[in-house]
């Protein structure tokens, strides 16, 4: 597959590691470098692209502000350092993006937020609303509450999960190396940069070293794992050097990097997962008007639902049937079974008065809905 161009992509996640963002000697943000990156992000934003940032650095910034000694931190020390660093990190991103008239929204996530469907939907909705408002979500693992048993441990895989969650079509991992090499370039003069990876094979995985630093928990192995997550969900990924000023501009200009390509697109991959990999927990029967709307690519609104069967939680997969009981499709429902039954047949403005809270306008959003024949 040919190497893509940066301008081919509409929704982009940019991951920035601690070793790029923080000067390891001074323990402070590399302000000049970050200003250049923010200018690159602003240019993409002006061109109408959705941009999200997955930013490391909270622990590194916190330990600097607290003047902690070098060396490994215990879990509770890391959590406390992150509590201080997250404030500084959020302020930093807000200021550099604000210089370009762009609002920044901080989102702190844990492993469960991307693995438990209800929390997944909440996080995805927050990201979607920020993007709708033309803000830039700045996402980090919530190191203040994550434990060793329930954490990512690196932001490469977190970035891949965020890209999947947001249906991004490109994930950029800015690193201290400009891509995947056939051998460690620091010790092997014959090492060659691999410009395009069509599939993550055992051979590709074997090329990943274990390089990391005191400030950064990740290495090439975690980047390969991120590539597997991203490409399986229909998101292209690339690794490029962030050690230069204006790294995104360099990528756009054809600079050295490694592309990990996928034949699918995010929406197709996600809908394949909904249709074939999730066990339905219930059924929604809808009227003829709703059937027509769904087949025209619309979301399913409460007004179109005439019957609710089964016991399901918010975020579970359900079958959608027409008035003749024929299966119309499958999707992830935005309400649990009890609430869905209470608001069926009612207009969206009635939902708040019935439930006492402001709920989703849709029973199933079109991005969470697969309309077609039932899987075999």
Curated annotation (Swiss-Prot):
Isomerase keyword on record: no
Organism, as annotated: Rhodopseudomonas palustris (strain HaA2)
Protein name stated in the entry: Glutamate 5-kinase
Keywords, in A-Z order: Amino-acid biosynthesis, ATP-binding, Cytoplasm, Kinase, Nucleotide-binding, Proline biosynthesis, Transferase
Any one of the GO CC terms: cytosol
Residues annotated for ATP binding in this entry: 15, 175-176
Annotated Pfam families: AA_kinase (PF00696), PUA (PF01472)
Pathway connected to this protein: Amino-acid biosynthesis; L-proline biosynthesis; L-glutamate 5-semialdehyde from L-glutamate: step 1/2
